[in-house]
Amino acid sequence: MKRFTVLILAIFVAASTVEADVRFSLSGSSSTSYSKFIGDLRKALPSNGTVYNITLLLSSASGASRYTLMTLSNYDGKAITVAVDVTNVYIMGYLVNSTSYFFNESDAKLASQYVFKGSTIVTLPYSGNYEKLQTAAGKIREKIPLGFPALDSAITTLFHYDSTAAAAAFLVIIQTTAEASRFKYIEGQIIERISKNQVPSLATISLENEWSALSKQIQLAQTNNGTFKTPVVITDDKGQRVEITNVTSKVVTKNIQLLLNYKQNVAAFDEDVSAKH
């Protein structure tokens, strides 16, 4: 019996002491600490070099090397550790103590074989794409406030796994971490919301939806004299629709920080990638 107890304890300790690659704590946080965290997250994503000085994510990765881990702590010090796919910055699932929660999708199921080993696995009742999360939350992203207070609430919700509020919590965490790592503008929008919650701007939602399209056109522009083969329409910070046609646009030169690798993700680009996170 003693040996059995020791074994259970060893499994619990192994699952609950996962070493994260990047960390962010809301306790004592500031714009500086948040920007450092987002910068660290970008650096934690291995790349295939750059395209027009923008980091090009790996086309593929295998085994445990396909994932990076980030630990997020609320104002009370309660923490969750989140698994992120390094090829697309998609969140696969998260760990609290000895229990892990993964999205109900093939990529997340694969991730569960390599991260949070020894944990008790719970499969969430939805996948991680925006459409499914919004349906589960009963709200679209445009209606869900972002900010440090919202992040605190989201971490708390996932820490205790409140099933009725988890989907909305994921929407907050995805935008505060993954989307902010993809776009400097979104990082700045979160910083503006350090002390308050506010719904995302139309420009934020637009950039999130068009990340894959922008990634593709920026890569294709390399063989087209810097011109997009297909213009990408986004909404700017004034609420105006703007057509992006080449790599001289500020969206390319000052905003986007990561590119989804087009050459090895053709199938993904052929899907409705804007629905994914």
UniProtKB/Swiss-Prot annotation:
Signal peptide extent: 1-19
EC code: 3.2.2.22
Enzyme class: hydrolase
Any GO BP annotation: negative regulation of translation
Active site: E179
Catalytic activity: Endohydrolysis of the N-glycosidic bond at one specific adenosine on the 28S rRNA
Pfam families referenced in this protein's UniProt entry, alphabetically: RIP
Transmembrane residue ranges: none
Segments forming a coiled coil: none
InterPro entries, A to Z: Ribosome-inact_prot_sf, Ribosome_inactivat_1/2, Ribosome_inactivat_prot, Ribosome_inactivat_prot_CS, Ribosome_inactivat_prot_sub1, Ribosome_inactivat_prot_sub2
Keywords attached to this entry: Antiviral defense, Hydrolase, Plant defense, Protein synthesis inhibitor, Signal, Toxin
SUPFAM superfamilies: Ribosome inactivating proteins (RIP) (SSF56371)
Molecular-function GO terms, alphabetical: rRNA N-glycosylase activity; toxin activity
Transferase as UniProt keyword: no
Family: Belongs to the ribosome-inactivating protein family. Type 1 RIP subfamily.
Name of protein: Ribosome-inactivating protein luffin-alpha
Organism for this UniProt entry: Luffa aegyptiaca
